[in-house]
C-alpha cells in the first residue's frame, strides 16, 4: 500500500503551475521552465522541501498535499480565493506623479514598483494621476497545479536544515545541525536576536518531536 503524507510531514515535491490558457508561471522543474520559455539562470530548479501545513508555499496548494500518496501525480485547480486572491478595487490607488519624480522614475504602464514595501504595477498614466494596481499580478485568476510528492523526509537533521533554510534564507551548506538523542544544536553563520532563535527553537521542537533545540553562532561556545 502506498505511503500517504500528513500535516507536519517534511516532503520533497515537484510542481508546475499553469493559467487557464495553459501558460506556465511557476515550476520546480528545469525542463518545464525551458519548454515554457520562463527559464532563469538565477533559479534553482529542484524539488521543493516543504513542511506540510506550514504554508511555506502557496497556502491553497499546501492544503492539497495532506493525505496524498508518495510517488503519485495529482492535478488540482485552485479558485482565486485559494490562489492569489480576488481582484480588489481598493488596491487600485492613485499615486502622485511627484512620488515618481522624487525617486527619478518614469512611470509607464506595466512598470512594477515598490512603494512603502508594497509591490504594485502601474496601470495608467494620465497627467499628474498615476494609477497603481497593488493586486497580485495573478489576482482573480483560477490556476491549476500538477504536483508529485517524491519522498517523505525522515532524517531529523535534514528537517532542521531545510526549515531554517526556508525561514532565514540562509544557504543550506551554511547551516550546521548536530542531533544527539532528543536534542539538537544549530550553528548559524549569523547571530540572530534571542527572541528570534527562541521562537524558532519552539517551532522546531513542535515540528520534529525533539525535546530541545539550541542555537549558537559559528565559532561560539554552546549556550
Where are the model-predicted features located?
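FKBP-type peptidyl-prolyl cis-trans isomerases
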Residues: 1-223
